[in-house]
């Protein structure tokens, strides 16, 4: 992260608030869990979950979003690089910084289009 002349941090890859559901699976576990993607960039995600996930854990994640009348997703393989306790009204859990380690090119294109889109995620259209 760089510091601008005005003293504000500038990221190489800007983050976009998303508020989208995701499913994740710890690489060594047979079951899936859920959470919310708070924001994203081309290199990482800020995710929210009620589960306590250790730093360094590798996750397979599918971020879900509507496309017309269907639900679609893009998938990433990532690593938890930081975590914080997080509280909201009637909710307690964790925020995690997830570094994207691997993503298929088609999924990367979907993520980039979602991030660069000026419309709401529910209006995002995936190329056929």
How would you describe each model-predicted region?
Residues 1-40, 48, 112-128:
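N-terminal helix initiation/capping motif
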Residues 87-128:
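C-terminal output/interaction extensions
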């Amino acid at each position: 992260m760089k510091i601008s002349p005005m003293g504000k941090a500038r990221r190489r890859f800007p983050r976009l608030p998303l508020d989208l559901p995701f499913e994740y699976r710890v690489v060594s576990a047979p079951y899936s869990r859920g959470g919310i993607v708070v924001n994203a960039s081309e290199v990482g995600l800020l995710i929210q979950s009620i589960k306590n996930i250790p730093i360094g854990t590798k996750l397979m994640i599918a971020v879900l979003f509507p496309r017309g009348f269907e639900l679609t997703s893009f998938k990433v393989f990532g690593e938890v690089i930081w975590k914080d306790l997080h509280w909201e009204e009637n909710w307690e859990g964790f925020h995690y910084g997830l570094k994207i380690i691997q993503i298929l090119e088609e999924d990367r294109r979907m993520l980039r289009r979602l991030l660069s889109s000026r419309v709401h995620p529910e209006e995002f259209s995936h190329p056929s």
